[in-house]
UniProtKB/Swiss-Prot annotation:
The keyword Phosphoprotein applies. Residues 53-82 are annotated as: Disordered. It catalyses: RNA(n) + a ribonucleoside 5'-triphosphate = RNA(n+1) + diphosphate. Residues 286-483 form the RdRp catalytic domain. GO terms for biological process: DNA-templated transcription; symbiont-mediated suppression of host gene expression; symbiont-mediated suppression of host mRNA transcription via inhibition of RNA polymerase II activity; viral RNA genome replication; viral transcription. This is RNA-directed RNA polymerase catalytic subunit. It is found in: Host nucleus; Host cytoplasm.
Length: 757
């Protein structure tokens, strides 16, 4: 049947149909190949925006650096990074005047955090540039490698477990004349296989010691590795994102802690809150502007867009802001906070993997690593790539590009928000000293500006003044991409405001469906997503009921667990039918065991096992949730688990769902192909680390893993704990004398082995 799609919208107000224009159904685009080209674009663009700055050379690394601060005032609308220090400082002073004590109080809060944060804070986060191996690794591994190298070079402050002490080590490491590191490498040999008599390639993983001189070490410590940002919807071109190494991360964390604390106190800041809290905050600002624009005033709102926010920001400006915000604080605190921006003004961008070349005629493929771009003959490249390489060559050192101006993506979201809000703050009548005034919202690079004035000329004058003020702080509002409306209709961080926020449901679409973790988690996450959308996103009861039915259908197809009385044949249907026939109370079977679905929109908050518990056969209960059943996963039985949801925009959200450990909460095994690669050494280290921690947990069950305090090592702590426990168990008659003696003997053997070692 043909349906005219416009009929669907006859009864829908136009603003509610906004969802349908969003590119959020289907798979998002992923990037393939290397990010080298995108990174060169970023580096070249950033330098172009600041080209009228002053060139200097870094005395330690020899890197050429461009400093656009206090550069020429712009004469046209082209984006530029020439922020003026005195203007930034003045904006900060006015921000403090409007919010008395804001910096002081935030500094005090941050100082407490600095003294309490443990170094394991840095294990959060995904891929991190590991400077010891010169490539990306999971954050925990990169941290472990860094600490190990520090230890082997005589830096041990970090062993206290405080992040601040680890940062002291980082500072010390930069003064050293050389650093010894261990790197993994691969050897390939062609050998004949005894069984098949074919030639095969054997790979062996070796570790070799390497010494880095001061210059090479500094380059690595200041390096941001780059990758292509994946899964960006609604864009044709990909772009590069950066991942910093462990030396930089800790310092950035403390700066962002201070900035976050400030943002929490600013009503115009869209960070760090999210969701409904953010909407409430925004609605307040709009309400204030609407009520104050009495009948005599006009009120207009700009849905704002900034050109290349990151590439025009400047770490030197952030240094000025931090210096101002911490001006009455102790010296050590000011020093800790000023290191991040200093490191960023000396940062190096790693160009990624390099380029792949293939010759169609000779069926040859070869990789040109980034390190070779400085010297290779350019005749092999096409025009656009040739231009990029020529432009970037003067900046190259050891395969990385010197990138002093600009702030790669996502590094100082909070601090740059403070900068943006400081301009919104200047819109008060006591600062504009005229008939127009403005206010607005800022969230990282996204903003909405509300301007009030008696007439259209006043509105225009207000917008112009805002635009020029932004230019002075290195912010470039895009005149092409920003648009203005009567207040009451605007968009901010993909929230659409039309006399109140309209649910933009399309953005939640990617999180519907089966997540693919395991049968237990997937069921729980699926119904939780539907429940959350009924609460937050105007998902009505009828649609929710339909979403639920579609989800159950999807779930059954994914896990091949159609009802026991169905005709559908799958690999599992034989087992499921057998279970169905021998089950007295069929309603008690979980959906994943071929049972019926008992969910409706009223009971989405109850985990399925609890929902059906009373209906289950006793022996089924015993199999499903019995701790003695080897198939019941007991990694940790917490009532809440976290799933990482990827909403359509913004960072991955943590979503809580109820977790009941059953035979269905299995954990998939790691892909074996990793075992044949150079990652294998890393994997073995990781497993070793895991085993030690698990063992430690067994001895100190209540411990969330913290290094035992005092001088004892982990082994000594475990041995002494074992002795105490054994004695208590022996005296209370829980264990026999033989067992007690055996435990004591083992403890002594362990100590003896340690002494010999």
């Amino acid at each position: 049947m043909d349906v005219n799609p416009t009929l669907l919208f006859l009864k829908v107000p136009a603003q509610n149909a906004i969802s349908t224009t969003f590119p959020y159904t289907g798979d998002p685009p992923y990037s393939h190949g290397t990010g080298t080209g995108y990174t060169m674009d970023t580096v070249n663009r950033t330098h172009q925006y600041s080209e009228k700055g002053r060139w200097t050379t870094n005395t330690e690394t020899g890197a050429p650096q461009l400093n656009p601060i206090d550069g020429p005032l712009p004469e046209d609308n082209e984006p530029s990074g020439y922020a003026q220090t005195d203007c930034v400082l003045e904006a900060m002073a006015f921000l403090e005047e409007s919010h008395p004590g804001i910096f002081e109080n935030s500094c005090i809060e941050t100082m407490e955090v600095v003294q309490q944060t443990r170094v394991d804070k840095l294990t959060q986060g995904r891929q991190t540039y590991d400077w010891t191996l010169n490539r990306n690794q999971p954050a925990a591994t990169a941290l472990a490698n860094t600490i190990e190298v520090f230890r082997s070079n005589g830096l041990t402050a970090n062993e206290s477990g405080r992040l601040i002490d680890f940062l002291k080590d980082v500072m010390e490491s930069m003064k050293k004349e050389e650093m010894g590191i261990t790197t993994h490498f691969q050897r390939k040999r062609r050998v004949r296989d005894n069984m098949t008599k074919k030639m095969i390639t054997q790979r062996t993983i070796g570790k070799k010691k390497q010494r880095l001189n001061k210059r090479s070490y500094l380059i690595r410590a200041l390096t941001l590795n780059t990758m292509t940002k994946d899964a960006e919807r609604g864009k044709l071109k990909r772009r590069a994102i950066a991942t910093p190494g462990m030396q930089i991360r800790g310092f950035v964390y403390f700066v962002e802690t201070l900035a976050r604390s400030i943002c929490e106190k600013l009503e115009q800041s869209g960070l760090p809150v999210g969701g409904n809290e953010k909407k409430a905050k925004l609605a307040n600002v709009v309400r204030k502007m609407m009520t104050n624009s009495q009948d005599t005033e006009l009120s207009f709102t700009i849905t704002g867009d900034n050109t290349k926010w990151n590439e025009n920001q400047n770490p030197r400006m952030f240094l000025a802001m931090i210096t101002y915000m911490t001006r009455n604080q102790p010296e050590w605190f000011r020093n800790v906070l000023s290191i991040a921006p200093i490191m960023f003004s000396n940062k190096m961008a790693r160009l990624g993997k390099g380029y792949m070349f293939e010759s169609k005629s000779m069926k040859l493929r070869t990789q040109i690593p980034a390190e070779m771009l400085a010297s290779i003959d350019l005749k092999y490249f096409n025009d656009s790539t040739r231009k990029k390489i020529e432009k970037i060559r003067p900046l190259l050192i050891e395969g990385t590009a010197s990138l002093s101006p600009g702030m790669m993506m996502g590094m100082f979201n909070m601090l740059s928000t403070v900068l943006g809000v400081s301009i919104l703050n200047l819109g008060q009548k006591r600062y504009t000293k005229t008939t127009y005034w403005w206010d607005g919202l800022q969230s990282s690079d996204d903003f909405a500006l509300i301007v009030n004035a008696p007439n259209h000329e006043g509105i225009q004058a207000g917008v112009d003044r805002f635009y020029r003020t932004c230019k002075l702080l290195g912010i470039n509002m895009s005149k092409k991409k920003s648009y203005i409306n009567r207040t009451g209709t605007f968009e901010f961080t993909s929230f659409f405001y039309r006399y109140g926020f309209v649910a933009n449901f399309s953005m939640e679409l990617p999180s519907f469906g089966v997540s693919g973790i395991n049968e237990s988690a997937d069921m729980s996450i699926g119904v939780t997503v539907i429940k959350n959308n009924m609460i937050n996103n105007d998902l009505g009861p009828a649609t929710a009921q339909m979403a639920l039915q579609l989800f159950i259908k999807d779930y059954r197809y994914t896990y091949r667990c159609h009802r026991g009385d169905t005709q559908i044949q799958t690999r599992r249907s034989f087992e499921i039918k057998k279970l169905w026939e021998q089950t007295r109370s069929k309603a008690g079977l979980l959906v994943s065991d071929g049972g019926p679905n008992l969910y409706n929109i009223r009971n989405l908050h109850i985990p399925e096992v609890c929902l059906k518990w009373e209906l289950m056969d006793e022996d089924y209960q015993g199999r499903l949730c019995n701790p003695l059943n080897p198939f019941v996963s007991h990694k940790e039985i917490e009532s809440m688990n976290n799933a990482v949801m990827m909403p359509a925009h913004g960072p991955a959200k943590n979503m809580e769902y109820d977790a009941v450990a059953t035979t269905h909460s299995w954990i998939p095994k790691r892909n074996r192909s990793i075992l044949n690669t150079s990652q294998r050494g890393v994997l073995e280290d990781e497993q070793m680390y895991q085993r030690c921690c698990n063992l430690f947990e067994k001895f100190f069950p209540s411990s969330s893993y913290r290094r035992p305090v005092g001088i004892s090592s982990m082994v000594e702590a475990m041995v002494s704990r074992a002795r105490i426990d054994a004695r208590i168990d022996f005296e209370s008659g829980r264990i026999k004398k033989e067992e007690f003696t055996e435990i004591m003997k083992i403890c002594s053997t362990i100590e003896e082995l340690r002494r010999q070692k």
